[in-house]
Amino acid sequence: MRNQDAALACEVLNEEFSKEIEMGEISPVVAEMNLATIAIVGENMKHTPGIAGKLFGTLGRNGISVIACAQGASETNISFVVESKSLRKSLNVIHDSFFLSEYQVLNLFICGTGTVGGSLIEQIRCQQQKLMQERGLKLKVVGIADGHHALFTRAGVDLSHYKEELAEKGMPSSTQVLHDEIIGMNIFNSVFVDCTASAEVASLYKDFLMNNISVVAANKIAASSEYSVYSELKQIARRRGVKFLFETNVGAGLPIINTINDLINSGDKILKIEAVLSGTLNYIFNKISADIPFSKTIKMAQEERYSEPDPRIDLSGKDVIRKLVILAREAGYKLEQEDVEKHLFVPNDFFEGPLEEFWKKV
């Protein structure tokens, strides 16, 4: 019914059933506002098991709460009630699951357009058609953000010209904008991809997961921060039926974390891991010589895109420590960064002050 009729309807019904309410046989009638009813009707639903389970399972995985439901005795329809704000998302989920199943749509929000983010966007652009044709998977980038601008569109960003679109049509970017726009769009089957090295962006993961948005992070900060934060994010993801993945935190494109997960899940206990965990340091030590000074090898590592934007993160051992902590945690150990012993080959005072001072010292 219309919102303006709700109060009168409650009054009439409570008056009609006043005796039953007084005797405690029924509860007083109350009105819940801003709701919507969706009905699925189909002849083929009759005597077909699993339709209701598929429907409510799909809604649940996308964070849509069903307030009430009913199924007709003829088994040809299911009606249910959701919040009005979830109506569009519910319809999209149902159409994708039941009627438009030629492709499974995955809606991506990509934060960061630098070396990692830019390469990912280009890879998606090149593989979109192949994935649709061979895997039935339609990757749609519905949001892109860098340090200056953020662009969101349900229709999907044209990845061939995303830089121009971002500069011309994008709004000023901030973590608050990312938070509000991504959650506010309320899009089904959505994934937030963090290609930054920002602690502020990492702080958004919890709210995204709570709103049934999966998180895939190249950013190491969340998975290597306090163990309580790492553990909470994984627990929320499990409870909400979404993913919190960070495979590229260690080993770039190699499936190291996934392999550790498989070993642990099959009952193995990992006692020791040996690895060269810093591509930057490995590159520097291979290049440094009497002819190539230390400072030049650092510059070369940056030019070859081995190094972090701030090379001190690599040289201080911070990046390696983060990777060690992540590997240990995935192997089942409750390790903090402070538990890792480090021996630096660069004097401590090199890491003090601004980046310009560091370059002068090396």
Describe the residue ranges of each PLM region:
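A conserved regulatory-domain signal marking ACT and ACT-like small-molecule sensing domains
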Residues: 1-122, 127
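Predominant activation on well-ordered alpha-helical scaffold segments within soluble catalytic domains
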Residues: 7-14, 53-60, 88-95, 117, ...
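N-terminal glycine-/serine-/threonine-rich beta1-alpha1-beta2 phosphate-ribose binding loop
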Residues: 106-113, 117-211
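Rossmann-like NAD(P)H-binding beta-loop-alpha module
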Residues: 238-241, 245-304, 314, 318, ...
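Substrate-binding/catalytic subdomain of NAD(P)-dependent oxidoreductase enzymes
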Residues: 287-288, 295-362
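Rossmann-fold NAD(P)-binding glycine/threonine-rich loop
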Residues: 198-211, 220-248, 252-263
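General beta-strand structural signal in soluble alpha/beta enzymes
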Residues: 68-69, 191-194, 215-218, 244-248, ...
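Conserved active-site and cofactor/substrate-binding residues in soluble primary-metabolism enzymes
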Residues: 4-8, 50-54, 73, 82-89, ...
